[in-house]
Amino acid sequence: MNKLEELTCALEVNKAVYDAVRKNLKVGVSEQDIYELTKTVVDKMLPDVSHEFIGDFVGGKRCSLIGGDATDYKLKKGDGFILDLSVRCGNTWSDTCRTFFLGEPSAEIKKAYDTVLKLQSFGATLVKPEICAEKVKIDAENMLKDMGYGGMMPHHMGHLIGAKPYMTPAFDIGHTDKIKTGVFFTLEPGLYKPDSWGLRVENDYVLQPDGAKLLFDYPTEIEYFIV
């Protein structure tokens, strides 16, 4: 397989994991349970291909920490759950994120989630060949400030992927390299309220001469992730 085929392969695994989580996530399930479910799906999907995975498995108030390893924390009604998953198929890594909700989210969270989706769409219009990487973060932060969410995205706006699950330049302050045609990259806007909630949505793209092409065709609307 070439690199694009390997990434496509990995992204099919990401989809299968999210499908499995939607079916199995419920009150009383632990972060560790979801980690084990993820491992089962990844191994089943790639029995004859060199593979591995890493990810963030955080629920409840732990979502405000942005990420972290799975613990024995058991999910409660009203919790969010962030599953940020990187899968290696052959020599190429994917990196996507979805946020699930155990029950109807509050109006505050719904508004924040909608803002994240708008920011992701905005980011996809920004990434063009030869753009300075940090400009994507700067413009994203300006948009968040205008919408009343200034300072609530304390991480980069995305990064390159490929031979590693995280590669530079990232779309972050201080990353002044220009983005080249043909690279694989992510956009992962997120919003976080300390000791309360957090949410993030991440998709993978390839940069073509005319701009970003989405490679991860999986739902993002919040209703799809309410379980």
Predicted feature residues:
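Active-site neighborhoods and metal-handling regions in enzymes and metal-associated proteins
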Residues: M1-V227
